[in-house]
Regions:
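Feature marks extracellular polysaccharide-active and adherence modules
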Residues: 65, 72, 78, 84-86, ...
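Well-ordered, non-transmembrane segments within structured domains
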Residues: 46-60, 163, 171, 198-200, ...
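Intrinsically disordered, low-complexity regions enriched for glutamine and histidine
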Residues: 2-3, 156, 191, 323, ...
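Extracellular "leader-to-stem" segments immediately downstream of a signal peptide or signal-anchor
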Residues: 1-139, 162-164, 199, 222, ...
Length: 760
């Protein structure tokens, strides 16, 4: 990593606007970088210099203190680097802007490059962006503010991106994903992106807020608000009136344009005062055998004062989209389904304005009002214990770092808490670790992260603790968290636990203990990756948060036992997270051929996981679940004497006998549930099963022949008559039954042609 020559050390900064204490590996206003936070001098090169430094040491956080930073050209955020500023919520009562980016760039009709270009496992957090050259009297076009590059030029731009806590005061274009063009490669051939996280993005955009296409694995979008009010409120920046801004956006702007995006959920999206609220457009990916189009679900979509609410041009064949517990109010049309196939399903959704097109289904069942906000988790004592600088750890993947890490953990515990910091690197650990009360074991990553094919980086622990065990479920976890303790911003992998390395049987893995156990109340596991983990996370305490857990789990992803108020958000299990890794090229002697990105290795993983892997299991617990996705697993949910609410979860390519839910004496609510293949639900014992909004492709006990391939069907097994089922036995065709909901009154297709002319 070059620590001896280049490492200047990390430090805690005085800023409580982030979800946890900010540990900065570089501060742009420091002398060696030289950014001006008064907004006078050009800070572009200073910020680039800080990013380059942090990228050189393997990844980490570049901090921009509160102030104004003038930027005059595009900035690339490198792999495993996060830009963090001081976030000021624009819905607050003051006109404070926190870290304000003055985007003093030249107007251009070109959409790219973006002001900030994000590479894999990078992030931009806590910035407010203002374009000083933009006026309503002379509206000028600018490229997108954020560019999610995708793999058009390099695999390094393909996977995992975060834009969070960001305000756009007067952007012309907001965020684009997979719009980057490589002139030597056809559009749609290799420019897909994966794992885009957009959270808490607010602002006024004049042309388009989100323009996202060609997503090949799941991300999620939450708390996105586009409204004229944000520019109008910026009176210190010479803002126009809200009526003037609204007059422009309502005649020219589209808040969300979404194309061939797979499986992603959308929570709490609010659009006010635009020409079009949400436009589902044709995708770009070249995939002739099985063309990809939009499929996903919205929960609490709120569209107000628009000309067009939801307009759909293309949907995935046989599938469609879900809109649940929402409001769509528009002058000319609330919903337009112009897709040649696929359906729009509205559940508990209030509309105002005409509907046009076929296959729009309305279900009036009152869906549950579910919690979608991440609970605030404990902030620890602001004392830093750097295992490299203070304890002599050598993170090269070969030196044993166990003693240094545990000594730092013990010191933090004795002193009443603190942050044990593992800078970017590879830490070999050979014994179990205990994280005491109020202590955070922290890697260098401040956002969701995963290994990128072609380049590994960030903080990774190599676990050499367990071999095969018959008592793996009850053995002591590799990392045990106390009360108010956390694991944050790192990845843990098992070099010896992959299918191709163990014995002669290519489908055998070591049964190991849980990687992490939250044993104390108010614990958290956030922005963590687990590669080739047999058992992932166990929760045996109250008020625990698990968020952005990305990995490959052979047996169990998350098990919640005798716990109350556990929150689980954005958990993914997919063998690609293990096989699309740069570790095999960096450590050729430590990792076997299963870590290579090869189709045969990948499907050996899937052959195992599709009959073994269980995602979320709860026993005697209450759990709120959001955005769980798996590919080739055996079971999504299991509940025994528990209460589970699950919102926006999906399962792709499950085997025929796979289960979405096994429920015994439990109360379960599923909202916007997507699945491909498998049986749906087994419910036994006194309890309830409430299902609002569901898409299913291929009946579980039938072969995936063309007779059923494009049919949206359901296969529900309910053993207890007390179980309450909404949406069972559906089949999308005319006439539909009462449980699915009634088709909307249909206008002739010629009316759609006329109405769509207004979108041009």
């Amino acid at each position: 990593m070059g620590y001896e020559q280049n490492y200047i050390g990390a430090r805690i900064v005085n800023d409580d606007s982030f979800e946890t204490t900010i540990v900065a590996d570089a501060v742009v206003t420091d002398e060696q970088f030289g950014a001006d936070n008064n907004g006078v001098k050009d800070s572009t090169e200073a910020i680039k210099k800080a990013i380059s430094y942090v990228a050189e040491i393997g990844g980490g956080t570049v901090y921009l203190p509160k102030g104004k930073y003038r930027i005059t050209s595009s900035i690339t955020v490198e792999n495993y680097v996060t830009l963090i500023g001081n976030y000021a919520d624009p819905d607050g009562s003051t006109e404070e802007y926190g870290t304000l980016i003055i985007a003093d760039v030249a107007p251009s009709s070109e959409t790219l490059p973006g002001l900030f270009r994000l590479r894999g496992s990078s992030g931009v957090v806590g910035l407010t962006v203002w374009y000083p050259q933009q006026t309503l009297t002379d509206v000028r076009a600018f490229p997108y503010t954020f560019e999610i590059m995708g793999g058009a030029f390099s695999i390094l731009e393909h996977m995992q991106f975060t834009v969070k806590n960001v305000t756009l005061i007067n952007a012309y274009r907001g965020l684009a994903a997979s719009r980057t063009v490589n002139p030597s490669v056809p559009v749609g051939a290799q420019d897909a992106h994966e794992g885009l996280v957009v959270e808490n993005l607010k602002g006024t955009v004049l042309k388009c807020g989100l323009d996202c296409v060609n997503e090949s694995d799941v991300g999620y979008v939450k708390n996105v608000v586009f409204s004229p009010k944000y520019w109008a409120k910026a009176s210190k920046l010479g803002a126009p009136t809200e009526d003037a801004v609204r007059d422009y956006t309502r005649n020219n702007g589209c808040a969300l344009m979404l194309g061939d995006l797979e499986w992603s959920p959308y929570y709490d999206i609010r659009v006010d005062g635009y020409k079009t609220g949400v436009h589902i457009i044709e995708g770009t990916r070249i995939q002739h055998e099985n063309p990809i189009a939009f499929m996903g679900g919205f929960y609490r979509l709120n569209v107000q004062d628009c000309l067009f609410g939801l307009v759909v041009d293309q949907l995935y064949k046989g599938w469609g989209m879900l809109v649940t517990h929402s409001q769509i109010k528009a002058e000319k049309a609330s919903v337009v389904n112009n897709a040649p196939e696929g359906y729009v399903r509205l559940t508990d959704t209030e509309t105002s304005g005409n509907m046009y097109g076929e296959r729009i289904f309305i279900n009036a069942a009152q869906a549950s009002d579910l919690e979608t906000q991440t609970p605030v988790f404990a902030k620890t004592k602001e004392k830093l214990y750097n295992v490299v600088a203070d304890y002599g750890a050598t993170p090269d993947g070969y030196a044993d770092c166990t003693a240094a890490i545990q000594k730092a953990l013990s010191d933090a515990d004795k002193n009443g808490g603190g942050i044990v910091y593992l800078p970017a690197g590879y830490y070999k650990v050979t014994q179990r670790l205990t994280v005491g009360n109020g202590v955070q074991l922290r890697g260098c990553m401040s956002v969701a992260n995963r290994d990128n094919l072609g380049k590994s980086g960030g903080t990774i622990i190599f676990c050499y603790v367990d071999s095969d065990s018959n008592t793996a479920e009850t053995d002591t976890a590799f990392v045990t968290l106390g009360a108010d303790a956390g694991l944050y911003g790192l990845r843990i992998c098992y070099p010896d636990n992959n299918i191709w390395m163990i014995g002669q049987n290519e489908y055998t893995v070591n049964r190991t203990a849980y990687t992490v156990r939250a044993a104390g109340n108010n614990g958290y596991i956030v922005n963590v990756g687990l590669l080739d983990s047999y058992n992932g996370v166990a929760v045996s305490a109250d008020n625990v948060v698990v968020k952005n857990l990305l990995g490959l789990f052979f047996n169990q992803a998350v098990f919640v036992d005798n716990s109350n108020n556990c929150h689980v958000e954005n958990v993914i299990s997919n063998a690609t997270i293990a096989t699309q890794s740069g570790l095999h090229s960096k450590f050729t002697d430590l990792f076997g051929k299963a870590w290579l990105w090869r189709v045969n290795a990948l499907w050996n993983y899937y052959t195992y996981t599709e009959t073994h892997t269980k995602m979320i299991r709860a026993c005697n617990s209450t759990v709120n679940v959001m955005s769980v996705f798996t590919f080739c697993s055996a079971e999504i949910f299991s509940a025994k004497n528990s209460v589970i609410t699950a919102n926006g979860c999906g399962a792709d390519r499950m085997w025929q006998d796979g289960i979405v839910l096994n429920s015994i004496a439990s109360d379960v609510t599923l909202v916007n549930q997507l699945k491909y293949n498998c049986m749906m639900f087994n419910v036994d014992g006194v309890g309830t099963l409430n299902i609002f909004g569901r898409m299913n492709l291929v009946l579980g006990n039938s072969p995936a022949t063309k007779d059923v391939e494009y049919n949206v069907v359901d296969n529900v097994v309910v053993k207890d008559t007390n179980a309450k089922v909404y949406g069972a036995g559906i089949k999308v065709s005319y006439p539909c039954d009462d449980v699915l909901g009634q088709p909307s009154s249909k206008n002739p297709i010629t009316d759609i042609v006329g109405i769509l002319k207004g979108l041009k």
